[in-house]
């Protein structure tokens, strides 16, 4: 993006921000240099790769929609890559240009010819990258709005993006919340790339898919049984974190109900699941923003009350994971026994 165009965009964003403030629209996150004005698609660089979050429906919807948008804008089949948080943090950013979605904007992404379309909270300003950001919308919805500017919308996508948005933002008061949770659970159960292959990249095929009947049965039968069992099987990890042992049902909904009903003394509840590639994922939930801080300690990320982290590959089993988490999340007390200077050495008791 040349300097003249960049200056114009920032100027437009400044005007737009002023209008939003004047009419009491949703304010931008503090410090974020983001822009959502006019025909934003005309400002997007041609990407060498599109990178999205692998763990949920929002990442799937956002990634596939951006791939369609790139096809429309540049007549190119751009490679889609999906990452978990741990993999993403370790990934080198070698591409000259990229679109990143459903992954938090961070300093290393502030590169010329890079675009980030995301909704996670951030305090960073974009000086080189194009940042399209709104914490009040899912990543999928932000990407869909870009697609609509190029005539890529449809009633089927309207419906699917709405359901994905409701599930990702956990909009409990929306009348479609239960159904939206079933859609979101498809990715949790069948995994990102399996579902992508089944749909052949056509998101519309997900609407009213027969697998939703499986999700509905699991919700009606498994969730109540799982909730009752898990309530009695919460294991301490640290003073602030409890491990919810789950044997059946939708882990996220079970943990959410435990938090809502204050069935546990722990402000953060954690679940673990082992992927087919033997990697163990920790999912964290809270009510007052504590989950994200714990996830970041584990080199993960996400939202304030809904976060996740991939544990090191050396952690092979759930018991190993519990031991690892206890070591990382409990403050070490060695400094209390370590002499701080010569006076401490001479004053230390001798036996």
Regions found by a protein language model. Name each.
Residues 166-232:
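Hydrophobic, aromatic-enriched interface-forming segments
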């Amino acid at each position: 993006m040349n300097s003249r165009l960049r200056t114009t965009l920032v100027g437009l964003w400044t005007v737009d921000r002023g209008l939003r403030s004047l009419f009491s629209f949703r304010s931008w996150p503090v410090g974020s240099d983001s822009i959502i004005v006019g025909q934003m698609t005309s400002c997007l660089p041609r990407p060498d790769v599109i990178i999205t979050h692998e763990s949920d429906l929002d990442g799937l919807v956002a990634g596939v929609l951006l791939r369609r948008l790139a096809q429309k804008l540049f007549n190119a089949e751009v490679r889609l890559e999906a990452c978990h948080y741990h993999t993403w943090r370790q990934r080198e950013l070698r591409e000259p240009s990229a679109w990143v979605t459903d992954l938090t904007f961070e300093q290393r992404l502030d590169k010329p010819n890079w675009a980030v379309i995301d909704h996670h909270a951030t305090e960073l300003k974009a000086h080189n990258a194009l940042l399209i950001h709104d914490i009040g919308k899912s990543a999928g919805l932000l990407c869909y709005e870009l697609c609509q500017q190029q005539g890529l919308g449809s009633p089927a996508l309207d419906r699917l993006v709405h359901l994905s948005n409701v599930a990702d933002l956990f909009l409990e008061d929306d009348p479609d919340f239960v159904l939206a949770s079933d859609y979101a659970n498809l990715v949790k159960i069948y995994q990102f790339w399996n579902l992508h292959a089944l749909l052949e990249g056509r998101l519309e095929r997900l609407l009213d898919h027969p697998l939703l009947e499986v999700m509905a049965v699991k919700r009606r039968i498994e969730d109540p049984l799982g909730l009752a069992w898990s309530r009695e099987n919460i294991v301490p990890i640290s003073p602030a974190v409890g491990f919810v042992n789950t044997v059946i049902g939708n882990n996220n909904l079970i943990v959410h109900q435990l938090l809502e009903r204050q069935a546990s003394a722990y402000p953060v509840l954690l679940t673990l699941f082992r992927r087919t590639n033997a990697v163990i994922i920790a999912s964290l939930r809270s009510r007052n923003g504590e989950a994200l801080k714990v996830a970041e300690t584990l080199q993960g990320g996400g939202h304030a009350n809904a976060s996740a982290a991939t544990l090191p590959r050396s952690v092979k089993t759930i018991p190993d994971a519990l031991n690892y988490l206890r070591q990382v999340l409990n403050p070490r007390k060695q400094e209390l026994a370590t002499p701080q200077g010569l006076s401490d050495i001479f004053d230390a008791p001798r036996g």
